[in-house]
Amino acid sequence: MTHEKFEGERTLMRIHIGESDKWHGKPLHEAIVEMLRKDGFSGATVLRGVAGYGGSSIYHTDKLLRLSQDLPIVLEVIESAERIERILPRLDEMVDGGLITLEKVRVILYRPAKK
């Protein structure tokens, strides 16, 4: 896959969901990453939080004695605003409970790993 010149103004999208969220029986974060990869996005990062709470105000933590942790997951994607805008309707279908934010960023270096 070739990448266009990526430096300059881009959009950072953050998708905040729970670890137990699913899409057609698959972990939601995995389904989103697969969708982004198939659509040719330059990359995505999945971050697993050690603790947090969201709209439900239920505090989730990674303490060992908890059986149901449902830790916070944040996906980060940096891409052109146009490409992100095109996938928002699909994300709206997939994300049943969560938060999606967009912000402008300035990419100063993007160097894909050599295979």
Predicted feature descriptions by range:
Residues 1-115:
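Positively charged, small/polar-rich N-terminal and surface patches that mediate targeting and assembly
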